[in-house]
């Protein structure tokens, strides 16, 4: 009796493609590990019949056992015939033989199936999927398979024999691949066991498995072949790159023809879609046309594949019947429109997938950081932040994350994927039809516009370059210039944020802006681990670690990290202050400074505490307030300036001006010997020498007291100041441009002059919201508000005493050092603070005023005594009558 044989079919779940060898993997982790090492260590299973003496798991139905032999890591197995090879190069050459034999050959009548020798129960036998004949060796099996291929060169691949109904799942994007050939066990009945022929084999239930491995990201259609997938993708892009030949095979394999293949070599089978893509352009065209013909009509000849597919309703041309069916369904059922964004989709499945994006459902999880994304495309774009190199690299130097764009780009190269010597593709040339990636997408910071000098802006553009007429930037291609003028100088903002309604010029800017609403910060700093929402902000932040300031002012030498900050700084040199406060008239050269200034007039600050009615100008002050007052914890303070921060990370980011002032001054002026703390200040100081002239010398400013504070003391008379009131004739004052009309004092900026004028006008535009006391400057109000909050951020490092104002700490330090820098010019007595000197100077003023009053009184008494002595003398009657009115007018009493 012939025992019913078992069929074992191996299913492999594939979802991801390796960009180097086109190997398919079932998970993203596997393809990433494979691409890092690119050592094709693949494990497949061979199913055979166990020896009688081997203990194996028995099948309850047949009682026979199956064993599984794993392929060693140093061996490579062909997925077509199961042959084991020792190196990747041998595997490639072996698979090339399969591909070369796929070409249609002359029709040869099918040879009768040779009678196989008696089968042994301890060996693996190979079954023909067409006639069910069994063979003991691969050579006999492949030779027999070749007879079927010669007889029907355009016949569709034989369906896979399945013992049970096939259930394809999971759904979209995860196809199951059935290996074409299966291994059957031989009968163990006796010596007379014969091999069943094609006629004697009973008809079994067969199921054809359609392999749909490639999914279009635009319309969600599935395709079986990469070529069909790429042709379909070309319909979505305006200017696809024309097809060219794929990387060719090795020269010795190309030179050989199918007739020259030795008989001992295994004959080819139709290559599975998960094998290496090693076909040349001609073989691809033949195979694609044959497969299309088989899909259209399995009984027609191959010439039917070239029939053009037109829609009868709109006369639109399609590349495949699948696309035509999708299009016809849109005529019957209509299109599917999203109710939220009005986007149109060709199928309900693509609309459902799109609605999942609106519902913020995240099905794709990043294995590195745990972030979830709604689509696989967003996940792959996110993984660029974790991988130093993109997933797909080309020998010409370009890298791609999208597989479709990489395959399109690879077609532009010649044989072997090497750039053509006649028309090399530069690495920076963008592919036509794909937009240039934005800075937030590529991870590279957007290069701010460098300062353009008059010489470069006035000169003509270099040959082969294109210059923008608005900003004088030069580009190597006209397409880059057009894109620059469109996105940089265009005032229209078409892209709107769906949450807050803010408009943007680019979609990438909207995506970066949306992260401010979601709180996502997927780009951490490798130095301090602070996360950012865009690569451009990360690159700008990293300049704080490196200390690099690439944008330098040509007037004063001050350097900046951003070109926008440099442009605003130039307004200071140009004395251009376009932003004026309507309350007090103070002008600013930056709009945000005017905004911060106006908060002091209203008394309402933007950051309000939820637990108390207090409000603050800065978020940092609010966080410190909540930490100290409501949480009862101590903040992190800067040891140099005493500023408080809610976390140690914010303290490390703090750039202390007091520490910079206390740093040793290493830059010395060669003209006057003055030392400054930076090269920019030295350059500005030398520019002041050049403006003063060769014969003039700049006056050296004393370290303390500062000139603005010393001039605030009202002096009764010039004599009280002595020699300190006049300047030395050998040291003329520094030239300054703005003069006060009241006291003739000079200032360098308009803001300083505006603040000084409040002394004469009595204006105090900064009231305290707690007690109502007003101040002339916002810094005075900030120091005053610490008296209400009880905050004392400035602590003495010697005794630990804390102060609310930094000036009080500086005065307190002189107690420990014994320094008394403020001396009275009248008596020579010295004091630690200027306020004590000011109080002492008042006593001298009072003494001086008392002495003046005494001198005036003595003078008046002397005048009255002289009048009285004159009145004692005897006068004639007429003269006496004339004197009386004069005496009464003078207030002198005449006795007698």
Curated annotation (Swiss-Prot):
Residues 239-301, 434-460, 687-733 are annotated as: Disordered. Residues 274-287 have a biased composition (Basic and acidic residues). InterPro entries: C2H2-ZF_domain-containing, Znf_C2H2_sf, Znf_C2H2_type. GO terms for cellular component: nucleus. A zinc finger (C2H2-type) spans 16-38, 76-98, 126-148, 214-236, 309-331, 336-358, 364-386, 392-413, 466-489, 495-517, 523-545, 551-573, 579-601, 607-630, 636-659, 667-689, 738-760, 766-788, 794-816, 822-844. The modification Phosphoserine is found at residues 113, 164, 298, 717, 728. Residues 707-732 have a biased composition (Low complexity). It is found in: Nucleus. The keyword Membrane does not apply. The modification Asymmetric dimethylarginine is found at residue 832. Gene3D superfamilies: Classic Zinc Finger. GO terms for molecular function: DNA binding; zinc ion binding. SUPFAM superfamilies: beta-beta-alpha zinc fingers. Belongs to the krueppel C2H2-type zinc-finger protein family. May be involved in transcriptional regulation. This is Zinc finger protein 574. It comes from Homo sapiens. The gene is ZNF574.
